[in-house]
Design a protein with these regions (language model features):
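Conserved NTP-binding catalytic cores of kinases and kinase-like/nucleotidyltransferase enzymes
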Residues: 1-72
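Generic hydrophobic, aliphatic-rich segments that mediate packing or membrane embedding
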Residues: 49-53, 63, 83-84, 103, ...
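Conserved kinase catalytic-core helix
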Residues: 94-128
């Protein structure tokens, strides 16, 4: 992906103020906050399921990178060459310092909170949807999960 490919952002209801490179992505400051643009090649059904889970977590106070829909209501947007991209609501922060006890303890607490939220009875609907999604996964996706 290069700067020319950022024209895919025209398919979103966003006004880009600035862009910079991230790890395998572009980060864009917009009127709706920070977003990340990354290349995507996978199942749209799985992506839809993933976004439902992330939204579920966000509603319960877990900070997540939510996928944004383009103006047509799709999660994946293609560039002029047919490459798929996703745009995620992003947030700035620093990485966990693995040499810092305080950072590690904080990460463990947050991970425990994440696990507790995902154990709620409401998550059963997501588990059933996941089982259905697993049946429609491509061979490539099944291979990656093994």
């Amino acid at each position: 992906m290069n700067e020319k490919d950022l024209v895919i952002l025209e398919q979103y209801d966003l006004h880009v103020q600035s862009t910079r490179r991230g790890r395998g992505s572009f980060l864009c400051d917009t009127d709706r906050g920070l977003v990340q643009v990354t290349e995507f090649s996978g199942s749209q059904e799985r992506l839809f399921f993933q976004n439902r889970v992330l939204f579920f977590l966000t509603e319960r106070g877990i900070r997540c990178d939510l996928l944004l829909e383009n103006t047509e209501g799709n999660l994946v947007t293609s560039d002029r060459y047919g490459n798929g991209y996703v745009v995620k609501k992003w947030f700035s922060g620093r990485e966990c310092d693995t040499k810092s006890r305080e950072d590690i303890v904080g990460a463990v607490h947050y991970l425990a909170r994440l696990h507790n939220v995902l154990r709620l009875p409401e998550i059963q609907e997501f588990q059933m949807a996941a089982a259905q999604t697993d049946e429609t996964d491509t061979a490539e996706e099944k291979k990656i999960r093994k």
